[in-house]
């Protein structure tokens, strides 16, 4: 078994546009250890989302290998890749996409039921996560009755519902004001660590990234460790 929950080895990705080929990932590599929260920093269009899509097995890279808990995925068929993604990976996006007709608790219960978790256990897990994220008094509120920060915390709980080993977050606080962003990220960080998971967080916010365990920056499709001046 690998010491890392996620490994990307020399990932290459090029998109074909009307203007020609557009390389966005040029040999990008990283390793993510259990309990580690890593910031992925770069401007819009630098390739952060493409890297997360490759890491989350949503897209196949043109070259390179993605290993999840030591399992190589390059040569697996789509069904096997989907099984790994559902079992081991959770996603948090800038826009939460909560189901509007369900309350906060139901939004966390539903993905567990889909995964085959018994209803009572799924409800208990949902209550525990939402309480840990400071939403104990908002369990039965629908998304429209929650603030933006509360909605994003529900989205974090949903991503953690099935106890993934890896959490991939794409600008998880990007649409929030600074104070709310700080509150949501603190809840995110504390909950991820309490769960024993690891997280890769894409952001253009250097201040937010500075609160993570380490930072990787994008430049010309390559990942490099950030070294403070």
Swiss-Prot record:
Give this protein's Gene Ontology molecular function annotations: ATP binding; ATP hydrolysis activity; transmembrane transporter activity
Give the subcellular location. Answer: Cell inner membrane
Instruction: Tell me which residues bind ATP.
Output: 42-49
The Gene Ontology CC terms held by the record are: plasma membrane
Q: What is the enzyme's main class? A: translocase
Q: What is its EC number?
A: 7.6.2.-
Gene Ontology terms describing biological process:
lipoprotein localization to outer membrane; protein localization to outer membrane
Domain of life, source organism: Bacteria
PROSITE patterns reported in the protein's UniProt record: ABC_TRANSPORTER_1 (PS00211), ABC_TRANSPORTER_2 (PS50893), LOLD (PS51244)
Annotated SUPFAM superfamilies: P-loop containing nucleoside triphosphate hydrolases (SSF52540)
Q: Does the keyword Cytoplasm apply?
A: no
Q: Which CDD domains match?
A: ABC_MJ0796_LolCDE_FtsE
UniProt entry keywords in alphabetical sequence: ATP-binding, Cell inner membrane, Cell membrane, Membrane, Nucleotide-binding, Translocase, Transport
Oligomeric state and partners?
Answer: The complex is composed of two ATP-binding proteins (LolD) and two transmembrane proteins (LolC and LolE).
Which family does the record assign?
Answer: Belongs to the ABC transporter superfamily. Lipoprotein translocase (TC 3.A.1.125) family.
Protein name per the record: Lipoprotein-releasing system ATP-binding protein LolD
* Organism classification: Bacteria, Pseudomonadati, Pseudomonadota, Alphaproteobacteria, Maricaulales
